[in-house]
Swiss-Prot record:
Designated name of the protein: Thymidine kinase
Keyword Kinase attached: yes
NCBIfam families in UniProt: PRK04296.1-5
Gene Ontology CC annotations of this record: cytosol
GO molecular function: ATP binding; thymidine kinase activity; zinc ion binding
Residues at the active site: E88 (proton acceptor)
Residues the record lists as binding Zn(2+): C145, C147, C182, H185
Gene: tdk
HAMAP family according to UniProt: Thymidine_kinase (MF_00124)
Catalytic activity: thymidine + ATP = dTMP + ADP + H(+)
Binding site for ATP: S9, T10, M11, N12, A13, G14, K15, S16, D87, E88, A89, Q90
Organism field: Haemophilus influenzae (strain ATCC 51907 / DSM 11121 / KW20 / Rd)
InterPro entries xrefs: P-loop_NTPase, Thymidine_kinase, Thymidine_kinase_CS
Length: 193
């Protein structure tokens, strides 16, 4: 039975690596996957899902105006699709999460979404909010804070490594711009304790 999955975490937990491994597992068994990533995240090249360990795969892009159900349904006219995988799923809109649920419910294709749960201000991203609400299965991918505890928050840093507390929710960056930390160190670094 097809399901909508949401694999969420803070940064540097291996979301893209896990997505790429899942896609590989399907393809190794001669099953087709459709891989999507957000058009606004071009850190490793446009139309690529790339992990920090150096593996990558070409991907279709989704933008705010992309109708994922229509696009996937159109792709089915060319070839069978066994699984849809979405990287950077926090950037999905509410409507796109709904469209992906239709892919599961109407087209009977499993959809695996990978993304951040919250931003640097500990607020849910729109895509994450609706995936947490509507996914059939939720799984947290874990990473650790510099103290060794489970990291479940992310700090945004400036060029000097100082914590930024305000700004736009979306700013594309990697290890140089963000640091995954535990709740205690998030509150401490943000001046909340």
């Amino acid at each position: 039975m097809a399901k909508l999955y949401f694999y969420y975490s803070t940064m540097n937990a291996g979301k893209s690596t896990t997505l790429l491994q899942s896609s590989y597992n399907y393809r190794e068994r001669d099953m087709n996957t459709l891989v999507y990533t957000a058009a606004i995240d071009d850190r490793f090249g446009v139309g690529k899902v790339t992990s920090r360990i150096g593996i990558s795969q070409d991907a279709f892009l989704f933008r705010s105006e992309t109708n994922l159900f229509d696009e996937i349904n159109e792709h089915l006219k060319k070839e069978k699709v066994h699984c849809v995988l979405v990287d950077e799923a926090q950037f999905l809109s509410k409507q796109q999460v709904y469209q992906l649920s239709d892919v599961v419910d109407k087209l009977k294709i499993p959809v695996l979404c990978y993304g951040l749960r919250t931003d640097f201000q500990a607020e849910l991203f729109e895509g994450s909010k609706y995936l947490l609400a509507w996914a059939d299965q939720l799984e947290e991918l874990k990473t650790i804070c510099y103290c060794g505890r489970k990291a479940n928050f992310v700090l945004r840093l400036n060029d000097q490594g100082e914590v930024i507390k305000e700004g736009a929710q979306i700013q594309i960056g990697g290890n140089d711009s963000y640091l995954s930390v535990c709740r205690l160190h998030y509150k401490e670094k943000c001046g909340q304790i």
